[in-house]
């Protein structure tokens, strides 16, 4: 399956055991089948050319940017470079051969290429998908274990070797079960023309359906589940970290604003420097309380200590405190009292720190980007996989006239992922983006 063309003649020649199939030239299905694409062949050529050039140039730039400073790159950047390389192979192997077979209605590249090319097409698409899973897993590991994150270049090499091994192993049946079939057109006893078709020749339909379902699971459902679970966990971890950081920064902000003297206030009282006097300002539950409170832990009572250190301050900056009488303080027991601002003083309002705003903005950016990654993968590859499943189980569901046109649309959507991956994984990566801008500047200067 993968990205190779599921030749229309697989279903019409499935019962043929010979290498030559005869078809009458007046057979209406043949003409209907050709007419679906002939009307749009120039549009398809232009669209395939645009998508191929865009995917090739975008992935080539990302690959060059990653290779410029490969000794300083992380495991994620190493995987992104391999993703760009695999997408280049997808563009080179899938677009030209598929478009040629669709427009010419025949296989022009010989028997050997009939066995090799579907295999290479399937492998490159599968490897690209498995690398997406690897990137998601590595990002999840880095977010969940930031302190113990010890991924090295050897881990990247191991992941790439595993990905290519799995791709080659899963797609290995394709070279065996592809064959070149000669299709001849005749009119009565006269032979008009002949053409060769590269078709899948499975021992039975059950083998073909089993292989299609396997590729559906490995190439689409498993990656989609992994991307969704991994990116959801990453977003949740970032959100939890942001909440704790938010509350910590708000508390520090409130303490700073409370302890900072007002500029237009009167004489300021000095805080006691006794080590056992501590001040901590807290904000109670927002739903029940709206006032600030202060908890003061006084020093142990004693005449000598009181004569040296004096009483605790009654003012903190521009804030007027009203504690209970000193004879009611109990040593070692915090006493909470209300902190009220002076009537004529300008108390700065509580404002959200710029650090919190930056963290929130970054969290939203990460959430949107990961959501787009999932949607792009799901939308771009879903039509092609559905097309393969539908045609394998019910080949009459799509009319003969529109068969190729529907396939080309599904195939182009899959190719669009190769154009969008450089943007989503490269241009939106700050490190790769900086290297890319430097590379473009060097190319422009030279």
Curated annotation (Swiss-Prot):
A Pfam family annotated for this UniProt entry: 7tm_1
Region (Disordered): 297-325
Molecular function GO terms recorded: neuropeptide binding; pancreatic polypeptide receptor activity; peptide YY receptor activity
Keyword annotations of the record: Cell membrane, Disulfide bond, G-protein coupled receptor, Glycoprotein, Lipoprotein, Membrane, Palmitate, Receptor, Transducer, Transmembrane, Transmembrane helix
Membrane disposition: Multi-pass membrane protein
Cysteines engaged in disulfide bonds, as pairs: 114-198
Coiled coil: none
InterPro entries referenced in this protein's UniProt entry, alphabetically: GPCR_Rhodpsn, GPCR_Rhodpsn_7TM, NPY5_rcpt, NPY_rcpt
Top-level division of the source organism's lineage: Eukaryota
Lipid-binding residues (covalent, S-palmitoyl cysteine): 442
This protein's record includes keyword Disulfide bond: yes
GO BP annotations, alphabetical order: cardiac left ventricle morphogenesis; chemical synaptic transmission; G protein-coupled receptor signaling pathway; outflow tract morphogenesis; synaptic signaling via neuropeptide
Residues on Extracellular side: 1-42, 99-117, 178-208, 391-407
PROSITE patterns, alphabetized: G_PROTEIN_RECEP_F1_2
SUPFAM superfamilies, alphabetized: Family A G protein-coupled receptor-like
Localisation per UniProt entry: Cell membrane
Transmembrane segments: 43-63, 78-98, 118-138, 157-177, 209-229, 370-390, 408-428
Chain ranges on the Cytoplasmic side, renumbered to this chain: 64-77, 139-156, 230-369, 429-446
Residues with attached carbohydrate: 10, 17
Gene Ontology cellular component terms for the protein in this record: GABA-ergic synapse; neuron projection; plasma membrane; presynapse
Similarity remark: Belongs to the G-protein coupled receptor 1 family.
Function, as annotated: Receptor for neuropeptide Y and peptide YY. The activity of this receptor is mediated by G proteins that inhibit adenylate cyclase activity. Seems to be associated with food intake. Could be involved in feeding disorders.
Protein name: Neuropeptide Y receptor type 5
């Amino acid at each position: 399956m993968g990205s190779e063309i599921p030749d229309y003649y697989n279903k019409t020649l499935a019962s043929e055991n010979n290498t030559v199939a005869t078809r009458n030239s007046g057979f209406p299905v043949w003409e209907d089948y050709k007419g679906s694409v002939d009307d749009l062949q120039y549009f398809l050529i232009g669209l395939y050319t645009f998508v191929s050039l865009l995917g090739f140039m975008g992935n080539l730039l990302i690959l060059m940017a990653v290779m410029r400073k490969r000794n300083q790159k992380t495991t994620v950047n190493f995987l992104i470079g391999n993703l760009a390389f695999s997408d280049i192979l997808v563009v080179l192997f899938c677009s030209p051969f598929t478009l040629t077979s669709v427009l010419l209605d025949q296989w022009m590249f010989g028997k050997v290429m009939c066995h090799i090319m579907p295999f290479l097409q399937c492998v490159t698409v599968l490897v690209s998908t498995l690398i997406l899973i690897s990137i998601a897993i590595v990002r999840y590991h880095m977010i969940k274990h930031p302190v113990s994150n010890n991924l090295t270049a050897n881990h990247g090499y191991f992941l790439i070797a595993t990905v290519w091994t799995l791709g080659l192993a899963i797609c290995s049946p394709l070279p065996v079960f592809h064959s070149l079939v000669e299709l001849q057109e005749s009119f009565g006893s006269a032979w008009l023309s002949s053409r060769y078709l590269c078709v899948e020749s499975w021992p039975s339909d059950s083998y073909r359906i089993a292989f299609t379902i396997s590729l559906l699971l490995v190439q689409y459902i498993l990656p989609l589940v992994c991307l969704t679970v991994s990116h959801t966990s990453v977003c949740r971890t970032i959100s939890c970290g942001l909440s704790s950081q938010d509350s910590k920064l708000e508390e520090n902000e409130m303490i700073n604003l409370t302890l900072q003297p007002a500029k237009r206030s009167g004489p300021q009282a000095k805080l006691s420097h006794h080590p056992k006097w501590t001040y901590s300002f807290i904000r109670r539950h927002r739903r029940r309380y709206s006032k600030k409170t202060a908890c003061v832990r006084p020093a142990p009572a004693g005449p000598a200590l009181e004569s040296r250190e004096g009483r605790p301050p009654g003012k903190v900056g521009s804030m007027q405190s009203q504690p209970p009488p000193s004879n009611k303080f109990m040593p070692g027991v915090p006493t909470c009292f209300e902190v009220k601002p002076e009537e004529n003083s300008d108390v700065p309002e509580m404002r959200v720190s710029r650090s919190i705003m930056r963290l929130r903005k970054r969290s939203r950016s990460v959430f949107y980007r990961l959501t787009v990654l999932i949607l792009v993968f799901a939308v771009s590859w879903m039509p092609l996989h559905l097309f393969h499943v539908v045609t394998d189980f019910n080949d009459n569901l799509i009319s003969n006239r529109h068969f190729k046109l529907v396939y080309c649309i599904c195939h182009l959507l899959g190719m669009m992922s190769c154009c969008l991956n450089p943007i989503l994984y490269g241009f939106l990566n700050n490190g790769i983006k900086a290297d890319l801008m430097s590379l473009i500047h060097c190319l422009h200067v030279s």
